[in-house]
Amino acid sequence: MQMLSVLNAFNSFPLAELEVGHHFYWQLGNLKIHGQVFLTSWFVISILVVASIAATRNAQRIPKGIQNLMEYALEFIRDLAKNQLGEKEYRPWVPFIGTLFLFIFVSNWSGALIPWKLIKLPSGELAAPTNDINTTVALALLTSLAYFYAGFSKRGLGYFKKYIEPTPVLLPIAILEDFTKPLSLSFRLFGNILADELVVAVLVLLVPLFVPLPVMALGLFTSAIQALVFATLAGAYIHEAMEGHGGEEHEEH
């Protein structure tokens, strides 16, 4: 009894605590969805839509301000797609790769720059969309569908030859690879963003003034790198599906 009283007294102290995986659910029929992910995802989409409208509403021959920023982002994405897919194949895939990159980039930075936890919900808490495994898995599955479509549309039924080349013995490994690609994409992005937010949250709880600032700056850099890695791998997978394992090398630029 004395031990229990000591433990209860210890638990009464206002110690900092950090919860992970506390979700706010919406009920749609028999389906439960993560409401906070929808809210923050639409917030990120709204930022991208507003930025696009602002950049193109009064386009100037000499870009400046938001137009200059968006044109720089477009050139960066176009170069990224060209490097991964080659001069002949990259243009149709710029919108897809660009959408992936911009959504992940803004989502990651929203988790680092916006104090989501200050917004109170009936239950659960807001966080970056990429801080939820469902978002990263959905992005990875979209990438998988994209490279299946790219390979089948470019090579037809010949696309399925990749499963038995150079020898049918490798068929199980080739099939397994189709599952490991989206898994690696989704868990890499989710793990890095979750770890970054947890480290910053713990440091803010322990030392709430200046120590977390360098970690937050590093988190911004890491968030940008994760968006770049995801988009780069998506482009590489699409190119591999179109050209095959023994396809031509990327054109030099």
UniProtKB/Swiss-Prot annotation:
Name listed for the protein in its UniProt record: ATP synthase subunit a
Subcellular location: Cellular thylakoid membrane
GO cellular component, one term: plasma membrane-derived thylakoid membrane
Gene it is expressed from: atpB
Quaternary structure (record): F-type ATPases have 2 components, CF(1) - the catalytic core - and CF(0) - the membrane proton channel. CF(1) has five subunits: alpha(3), beta(3), gamma(1), delta(1), epsilon(1). CF(0) has four main subunits: a, b, b' and c.
Transmembrane intervals: 35-55, 94-114, 133-153, 198-218, 219-239
Main location: membrane
Record keywords, A-Z: ATP synthesis, CF(0), Hydrogen ion transport, Ion transport, Membrane, Thylakoid, Transmembrane, Transmembrane helix, Transport
Membrane topology field: Multi-pass membrane protein
Annotated function: Key component of the proton channel; it plays a direct role in the translocation of protons across the membrane.
Organism: Nostoc punctiforme (strain ATCC 29133 / PCC 73102)
Family indicated by similarity: Belongs to the ATPase A chain family.
NCBIfam families cross-referenced by the UniProt entry: ATP_synt_6_or_A
One of the record's GO molecular function terms: proton-transporting ATP synthase activity, rotational mechanism
HAMAP family: ATP_synth_a_bact
